[in-house]
Amino acid sequence: MPSKQIRKQSVILTRGARKREEDSGTDVGEGADDWAQSKAAVRPPDQLELTDAELKEEFTRILTANNPHAPQNIVRYSFKERTYKLIGFVNQMAIHFSQVGNLIPKDSDEGRRQHYRDELVAGSQESVKVVTSDTEILEEEEEPKEGEGEGEGEAEGEAEAGSQTDVPAAAETTEKVIEEELMAPVQPKERKLTNQFNFSERASQTFNNPLRDRECQMEPPPRTNFSATANQWEIYDAYVDELEKLEKTKEKEKTKTPVAKKTEKMAMRKLTSMESQSDDITKVTQAAKIVERMVNQNTYDDVAQDFKYYEDAADEYRDQEGTLLPLWKFQNDKAKRLAVTALCWNPKYKDLFAVGHGSYDFMKQSRGMLLLYSMKNPSFPEYMFSSESGIMCLDMHMDHPYLVVVGYYDGNVAIYNLKKPHSQPCFRSTSKSGKHTDPVWQVKWQKDDMDHNLNFFSVSSDGRIVSWTLVKSELVHIDVIKLKDEGSTTEIPEGLQLHTVGCGTAFDFHKEIDYLFLVGTEEGKIYKCSKSYSSQFLDTYDAHNMAVDAVLWNPYHARVFISCSSDWTVKIWDHAIKTPMFIYDLNAAVGDVAWAPYSSTVFAAVTTDGKAHVFDLAVNKYEAICNQPVVAKKKNKITHVQFNPIHPIIIVGDDRGHITCLKLSPNLRKMPKEKKGQEVQKGPAVEIAKLDKLLNLVREVKTKT
């Protein structure tokens, strides 16, 4: 009974204690909640208050490899140049933590070798300890024990006799153990080999030792004054003396036969004669070139006088008419019966122009030629290059006038360097480098790219306009745009649609807006395109009913361009208006058109009937002020025309390979007349205003109609 009461009391006590703990816990918890609710955030008075939208706005963080703590203006002294130079490249590497480790994985070959070596070392140490402990025990047993009396009697004598018998046996065992240890072969330490298949390299940056100049004193070398003349005969005599010395040394040698000596002498004589001939030929060619120019100057002296000074006096009696005076005629027998397919003046040498020869008869394609003529020598070209395929177009670089880019009938493009004498192009496209699949109709040099690499564009009948860049002596191509006829599509039985590809024939880039250019096609349409957009055209003009032969921006007015076609028409456009401003019918297929460099209203066109037409909109807006046949035979077709950038002359080429130079009469190049007390205004602004005045009249008429 008493034990049961004790148990009941303990249970009651424990229940009461638990209840008190729960009550105390609830009180503390409630007090903690009240304290947490009454807590307020402390904010500074100038803190920004952002809205929910601003708080939810995400900001992107960009990680860069640049070290913000790296110095930007390090200047070091260059002992080589003896000046302080700014260090352009600064090391951007920042090391946060570096530790050299010496741990080796246990499973690797090196770890196993090291574990094996440690075991060998530990085993040898234990064996030495065992031997030393045995010897120490034996020595202790040999020493007499202290505290023993001297008078022990017979028992002591027997013990000593027994110990004396045991000592030699123990000594023999220790000596055997030591001999075995010494006679055992010592294993050499295994050399640590590097793992050729699992290793890491650690790079370190070392400081380049600066160059230092060290001076020392020495005796000056002896000096003598020497003077001699170096000319052709002195050099020849020196070579002859050297040759005689060689012959004397060969005569002393007895091993060689006299026949071998004679052959060597003949070979040496041939080499010296060939060298002298090559030097003489180069000098003769230069002298012959000078003499040829002198002879031509005397032969064509009357033509040169007309080119420089003659002015047609009959223009005073003709108000709105002019004439073309024939000057020189350029032709070459090697380019006979090859049509003139391209003309271009050199931007630096104004008397030099390039001619491309090919064939417009596509059923009878032949070779091509690139010729460069000078007005100083009309009888023979200055440079001559031949090609297997016909040349269809060319252009000369503005900054590098010795570089000529050409386009071939087979779709290739090539660059010729006039400084190099060989006849092959320096750079040429191939089928692997993205050449055109149809004839290349026009090429144009453009500004260099960001890396100062040469750059030019080409257009072809395959519908591609390609940008070519000369990178590391190689032509790299990029398709800028592909011409697609938006209106015409053909359906395939499978349900697919094929877009008709436009055939590009001509293009021209804007003089001020670098990315803007025009493209003419065989379908008669003109597309306004941009270098930045390769998928669509900026504008489309339904210009002609037949192929567009040429399209050119006006050299003065930024909004005006001209086009000509085989449909007998020449049209002048404002690129902001889809209808032409002026239309001229020339009663024959127009092969080419060109703006005059001296006026914004003058242009020339050539037709297949052998006539050249010169227009001046400021004089007559409706008709040409000069219609003149410039080829002898009616069957000859004029293909191209070009104005000289400085002189008042034009050059025209026909399909027989002839180039004719013509001088413009004063009525074809009229300038503003001087008025009393007023200065004549000149410059691009005057030319722009003159053309704007004509265009405004046409715009007013169109708005009224």
UniProtKB/Swiss-Prot annotation:
Residues 1-44, 122-169 are annotated as: Disordered. GO terms for cellular component: 9+2 motile cilium; centrosome; cilium; cytoplasm; extracellular region; glial cell projection; microtubule; outer dynein arm. Its main location: cytoplasm. The modification Phosphoserine is found at S124, S127. It is found in: Cytoplasm, Cytoskeleton, Cilium axoneme. Keywords: Cell projection, Cilium, Cytoplasm, Cytoskeleton, Dynein, Microtubule, Motor protein, Phosphoprotein, Repeat, WD repeat. Residues 136-159 have a biased composition (Acidic residues). GO terms for biological process: cilium movement; determination of left/right symmetry; epithelial cilium movement involved in extracellular fluid movement; flagellated sperm motility; heart development; insulin receptor signaling pathway; outer dynein arm assembly. It holds the Pfam family WD40. WD repeats lie at residues 386-426, 435-478, 543-583, 585-625, 633-672. InterPro entries: Dynein_IC, WD40/YVTN_repeat-like_dom_sf, WD40_repeat_dom_sf, WD40_rpt. Residues 124-135 have a biased composition (Polar residues). One of its GO terms (molecular function) is dynein heavy chain binding. Part of the dynein complex of respiratory cilia. Consists of at least two heavy chains and a number of intermediate and light chains. Interacts with BICD2. Interacts with CFAP45 and CFAP52. Interacts with CFAP53. Belongs to the dynein intermediate chain family. PANTHER family: DYNEIN AXONEMAL INTERMEDIATE CHAIN 1, DYNEIN INTERMEDIATE CHAIN. This is Dynein axonemal intermediate chain 1. It comes from Rattus norvegicus (Rat).
